[in-house]
């Protein structure tokens, strides 16, 4: 825990850029060593006066507050020293020292992860193409990444979820800050089925300058980046250029020659910086040999078929009515086993009887700290009392007699 506290201290220094943070841990070996370094050592590194002052502030209060916030919100901290930290990010000169994760922990190095990026102000064609790509990629076994903005981001994420896959949203602000607010429902769906990621601690506002910095993580986690619609000067092109610098494949959807919203993507194709794509198959064919265990040959959808499935996603599905024989399908266990549980595991089991919830929801409803909830879930599942469903949802696997 002490090592993590020092790491959070370092990453919250005022005026610290990602490349400088990475350089400091390379120079000192660990964040703890940087914390205890002599102030004169900072000055020898040609750091700004503002950053040197911030490094001289040894208060750990904010770091400890962040740890408390993560515990309360059910946010997992993944550091560059952890075995699960993506090698894809460690290859970057400005890798994030910490990732805050709300939802599932993915092994990104093993995933055919494709980032779909594009403009907030997009055309109906762009929305349709982003949704179709997200859907087709998810159906074929790829992991779709994007931001959470209106337009292309939202369409891609919705498509991926409708395609039956998880999705990952990389945010510029904290993982608990939904921006724009109208995407609250989408945010919750992505967190339940996949993950929300950020390098910034909970509560960080999504200020404009944070988005270009965020983009290196979006492209860095991915095997490839697909640009759907972008003007000639846009954040999408920043992400595409970052991807090229990171030796990632770049793909682009063509648009009308005179369409302002396709000027950026058409330019990528014209300069040979991106491969022209018309469907997800044009992306998948590049990765079949690298990810044979991931790519599934899902039958291609027509444009009309994809649109129909995406439109159906907006319609709430009716609640299934159980048949009489299904009303109590769970195996019966003696009540003495329930009484032998501790108070917290028993409360969690009772909450999950007849419903499926993700850990965040359990924390919110029981007010049990996230770490103890996760421990209880692991034990209850190991004892056969709980089942884990897709989207990291848990539900009761047994019932107890009266």
Each model region followed by its residue ranges:
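Glycine-biased, small-residue-rich flexible motifs in mid-sequence functional cores and linkers
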Residues: 1-4, 71, 79-402
């Amino acid at each position: 825990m002490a090592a993590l506290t020092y790491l959070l201290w370092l990453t919250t220094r005022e005026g610290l850029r990602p490349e400088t943070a990475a350089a400091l841990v390379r120079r000192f070996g660990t964040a703890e060593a940087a914390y205890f370094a002599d102030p004169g050592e900072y000055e020898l590194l040609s750091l700004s006066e503002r950053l040197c002052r911030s490094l001289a502030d040894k208060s750990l209060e904010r770091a400890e507050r962040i740890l408390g916030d993560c515990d309360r919100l059910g946010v997992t901290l993944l550091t560059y020293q952890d075995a699960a930290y993506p090698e894809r990010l460690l290859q970057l000169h400005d890798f994030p020292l910490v990732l805050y994760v709300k939802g599932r922990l993915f092994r990104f190095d093993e995933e055919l992860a494709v980032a779909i990026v594009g403009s907030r102000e997009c055309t109906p064609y762009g929305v349709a193409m982003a949704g179709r790509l997200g859907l087709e990629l998810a159906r074929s076994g790829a992991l779709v990444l994007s931001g959470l903005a209106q337009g292309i981001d939202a369409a891609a994420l919705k498509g991926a979820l409708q395609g039956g896959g998880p999705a990952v949203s990389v945010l510029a602000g904290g993982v608990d800050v939904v921006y724009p607010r109208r995407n609250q429902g989408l945010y919750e769906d992505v967190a339940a089925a996949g993950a929300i990621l950020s390098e910034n601690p909970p509560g960080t506002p999504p200020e404009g300058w944070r988005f270009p910095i965020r983009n290196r993580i979006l492209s860095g986690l991915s095997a490839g980046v697909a640009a759907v619609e972008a003007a000639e000067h846009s954040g999408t092109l920043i992400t595409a250029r970052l991807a090229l610098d990171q030796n990632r494949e770049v793909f682009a959807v063509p648009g009308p020659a005179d369409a302002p919203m396709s000027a950026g993507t058409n330019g990528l194709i014209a300069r040979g910086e991106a491969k022209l794509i018309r469907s997800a198959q044009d992306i998948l064919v590049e990765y079949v040999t690298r990810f044979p265990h991931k790519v599934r040959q899902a039958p291609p959808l027509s444009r009309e078929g994809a649109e129909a499935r995406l439109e159906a996603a907006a319609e709430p599905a009716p609640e299934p009515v159980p048949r009489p024989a299904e009303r109590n399908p769970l195996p019966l266990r003696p009540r003495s086993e329930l009484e032998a549980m501790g108070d917290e595991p028993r409360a969690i089991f009772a909450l999950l009887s007849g419903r499926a919830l993700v850990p965040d929801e359990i924390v919110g409803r029981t007010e049990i700290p996230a770490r103890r909830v996760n421990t209880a879930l692991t034990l209850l599942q190991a004892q056969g009392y709980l089942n884990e469903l897709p989207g990291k949802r848990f539900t009761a696997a047994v019932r107890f007699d009266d």
